Amino acid sequence: MFRRALRLGLGPGLPYRGLRTRKGGFTLDWDAKVSDFKKKVDSILPGKKYEVLYDTSHLPPEQADVVIIGGGILGLSVAFWLKKLESRRGAIRVLVVEQDHTYSRASSTGPSVGGIWQQFSVPENVQLSLFSINFLRNINEYLAVVDAPPVELQFNPSGCLLLASEKDAATLENNVKMQRQEGAKVCLMSPEQLQTKFPWINVEGVALASYGLEDEGWFDAWSLLQGLRRKVQSMGVFFCQGEVTRFITSSTPMKTPTGEHVVLRRINNVHVKMDKSLEYQPVECAVVINAAGAWSGKIAELAGVGKGLPGTLQGTKLPVEPRKRYVHLWHCPQGPGLETPLVADISGVYFRREGLGSNYLGGCSPTEEEEPDPTNLNVDHDFFQNKVWPHLVQRVPSFKTLEVQSAWAGYYDYNTFDQNGVVGPHPLVVNMYFATGFSGRGLQHAPGIGRAVAEIMLEGHFKTIDMSPFLFTRFYLGEKLQEYNIL
């Protein structure tokens, strides 16, 4: 019984069928009174305009139904679907809090090469990709704004190619069978077939390959982010540049069916510290969405998540932390050319074509022992030389003459438990929901994740895609949802 209750989420607050803060239109009335007062002062006092009251236009609203922490792809997607699914226009007051409006530290766009593919080992990830590709192909049906230019994602449907050794061939074959059952168009290729289709590949060590026949490739992540931001602003979403530093909560002690004593918490206020200032604004709210990417673990701690005895539900942490990843851009006129898909090698190295000028993007995730310092975004150029380039040359001999043009670093919102995302409510902090921990896949899965969070928040259950395996409670229950196809 307890396991079933855990999976569904403990405590009151689900579903939120009518999101409310305090009754009345206090904020609107107050703003109108302040405006009238300023006009009277200006008409009485001579000379230059006199500002009697302190300007608070840079502050977030004092009340919101939903506060979304994190204004990246995932946070914006949640905001979009909340407004898209609201019962009437303006029914849900949404505030997005983002600390870095340049998105230089964003988990979904910084280290991403913009890839989208259906070749995963977890069925729900395949379903998310299929949902996303439909969203992206019809992007302007979703994100069009009156009198604004259309969103141009520059989608390149060149496919994704996964290579497997003899050891992993059976797993790859089973994955492809599952992917086809979910509706993905994926084929298996022998080394001979691989060599025929892509003659520039050295097939040494390759026992089997899988290739996406349609709806796979890459797109411009920045265009999607800006398109979502523009759209949700047009839908009435509020934005604030600041940092969440504190939650004001209320608590209720209770006992679980197994006899464990727990404390249910509810977030009543979010404290937002203004950018480059000592100022802060408390925001009264009904729901908090934790979409803070690589820093979502710290946000969860502020709400008391994991602040209990180890091995208990109260002491179960959100296992998401920042992991630094590099992306390298190189030029190689003798390279594979225009027919290059997104390639994932046996070694873990990946690459794709970038534009039409013989440029390529790629990289590789380090081993646990080689994890770089995440406190800065400095690029270790020796990593490419020692860990990436040798594998590139082994698989594509023409890359021997490549010249690195540039490189940058970004953060993965890395889930150390099973490298899969966390979606839905926390069982004890009953009005905190998660959209984080996708370990580099947040960009391509954002449309489906955003809808899933909006559905469970508004309806009390997942509808479009059943994301129950992604609930927070799996960390306490020890039920890993291991995804193996991670770039």
From Swiss-Prot:
GO molecular function: oxidoreductase activity
Entry cofactors: FAD
Subcellular localization, as worded in the UniProt entry: Mitochondrion inner membrane
Domain of life of the source: Eukaryota
EC code(s) of this entry: 1.-.-.-
Segments crossing the lipid bilayer: 62-82
Keywords assigned by UniProt, alphabetized: Electron transport, FAD, Flavoprotein, Membrane, Mitochondrion, Mitochondrion inner membrane, Oxidoreductase, Respiratory chain, Transmembrane, Transmembrane helix, Transport
Example of a GO cellular component annotation carried by this entry: mitochondrion
Top EC class of this enzyme: oxidoreductase
Biological processes, Gene Ontology terms: mitochondrial respiratory chain complex I assembly
Pfam families: DAO
InterPro entries tied to this protein: FAD-dep_OxRdtase, FAD/NAD-bd_sf
Membrane topology: Single-pass membrane protein
Self-association and partners: Associates with components of the mitochondrial respiratory chain complex I.
Biological role stated in the UniProt entry: Required for the assembly of the mitochondrial membrane respiratory chain NADH dehydrogenase (Complex I). Involved in mid-late stages of complex I assembly.
The protein, known as: FAD-dependent oxidoreductase domain-containing protein 1
Lineage of producing organism: Eukaryota, Metazoa, Chordata, Craniata, Vertebrata
